[in-house]
Curated annotation (Swiss-Prot):
One of the primary rRNA binding proteins, it binds directly near the 3'-end of the 23S rRNA, where it nucleates assembly of the 50S subunit. Methylated by PrmB. It comes from Magnetococcus marinus (strain ATCC BAA-1437 / JCM 17883 / MC-1). It comes from the Bacteria. The gene is rplC. This is Large ribosomal subunit protein uL3. One of its GO terms (cellular component) is cytosolic large ribosomal subunit. GO terms for molecular function: rRNA binding; structural constituent of ribosome. The modification N5-methylglutamine is found at Q151. Belongs to the universal ribosomal protein uL3 family. GO terms for biological process: translation. InterPro entries: Ribosomal_uL3, Ribosomal_uL3_bac/org-type, Ribosomal_uL3_CS, Transl_B-barrel_sf. Gene3D superfamilies: 3.30.160.810, Translation factors.
Length: 214
């Protein structure tokens, strides 16, 4: 298992196969990501590498974080994430990782935060039918109806579908096929859609259920 990469969702486009078939793709700017630290099974109890993405002003970081980057001899980064790996010794602190590690026709898992919708009612959030439009209905047209029983159990059950904040949740889409790789600009195109809005942060790993391309 090798390290994934941190990136930004650039938006969606389309590509055409040799036989003229059109496929929707999502463009992702991956890296360059610098290896800031390594975690080993002997010292930390697990194997991983810590990657930094997008350079940041040192003044915007705490003294502790600046010291961490100075120790690794890496310019300060805005985003810091860890990826589990099989062999951390195959990575060097300060090494730059780019999109060229992914190959066309390989499969990846993409993790991102879904588009936030704000406070939403039960009809939009959960697809409830709502109340009656007429025939005695009074201000219950988009209501969720009853939320429980009476004195027994005397409470609302956990995970009851109700109105609330919709979206802005971490989700992973698995087994997306890599349709194109631009090693120079460190951009990949994956078939289909991925979570998040344009410009949102995403994590791209080798597909867990398809096996690594190593």
């Amino acid at each position: 298992m090798r390290s994934g990469l941190i990136g930004r969702k650039l938006g969606m486009s389309q590509m055409f196969t040799e036989d003229g078939q059109r496929i929707p793709v999502t463009l992702v700017q991956l890296g360059p990501c610098a290896v800031v630290a390594k975690r080993s099974d002997e010292q930390d109890g697990y194997n991983a590498v810590q990657l930094g993405f997008e350079e940041a002003k040192p003044s915007r970081l705490s003294k502790t974080v600046r010291g961490q980057y100075a120790k690794a001899n890496v310019t300060p980064r805005r985003v810091l994430r860890e990826f589990r790996v099989s062999n951390p010794e195959s990575y060097e602190v300060g090494q730059e990782l780019t999109a060229e590690q992914f190959a066309v026709d390989s499969f990846v898992d993409v993790t991102g935060k879904t588009v936030g919708k704000g406070f939403a009612g039960v009809m939009k959030r959960w697809g409830f039918r709502g109340g009656r439009a007429s025939h005695g209905a009074h201000k219950v047209h988009r209501s969720g109806g009853s939320i429980g029983q009476c004195q027994t159990p005397g409470r609302v059950y956990k995970n009851k579908k109700m109105a609330g904040h919709m979206g802005q949740q971490t989700r992973t889409v698995q087994n997306l096929k890599v349709a194109y790789v631009d090693a120079v600009q460190s951009i990949i195109a994956v078939k289909g859609s991925i979570p998040g809005s344009k410009g949102s942060l995403v994590l791209v790993r080798d597909a867990l259920k398809k096996g690594s391309a190593e």
